[in-house]
Amino acid sequence: MDKLSEFCSKFVENVMKMTVNQLNKVTKELAKKITIDSNFKSVTDNNSVIESSKEITENKVIEKLEFNIILESFISSQRIKLIKTLRDLISIGLKEAKDLIETLPKTIYEGVSKEFAEETKKTLEESGASVIITENII
């Protein structure tokens, strides 16, 4: 597959994952940036494209793409281990890590992928933390 075909294929996959609101925003942004000759005839009119995308979106189970990781509490006997883990995970200093665990609950990450959120949760739980993953409202 050539690069253009691969790009188009990935683009279509990403578009299929979008909600109707996201598609509407993309359409408006494209309309602002692209000038199309008034003589250009579309294969389908805008309304049928919008209705088709609504049908696809409504029939498809949409999985949230972004998640937040919230550190709720920790086992006090594993405080030092958790501080070390936090310093490694979010690249903060010792004082910042200590301050963070003193003011729980705290959001550690916002808008991360599901896989990253699950891996991070596992790492934090191994360090004695109680962690919640919430959906990021898009």
UniProtKB/Swiss-Prot annotation:
Keywords: Plastid, Ribonucleoprotein, Ribosomal protein. The keyword Secreted does not apply. The keyword S-adenosyl-L-methionine does not apply. InterPro entries: Ribosomal_bL12 (IPR000206), Ribosomal_bL12_C (IPR013823), Ribosomal_bL12_C/ClpS-like (IPR014719). SUPFAM superfamilies: ClpS-like (SSF54736). It holds the Pfam family Ribosomal_L12. It is found in: Plastid. One of its GO terms (biological process) is translation. One of its GO terms (molecular function) is mRNA binding. One of its GO terms (cellular component) is ribonucleoprotein complex. It comes from the Eukaryota. Belongs to the bacterial ribosomal protein bL12 family. Forms part of the ribosomal stalk which helps the ribosome interact with GTP-bound translation factors. Is thus essential for accurate translation. This is Large ribosomal subunit protein bL12c. It comes from Euglena longa (Euglenophycean alga). The lineage of its organism: Eukaryota, Discoba, Euglenozoa, Euglenida, Spirocuta. The gene is rpl12.
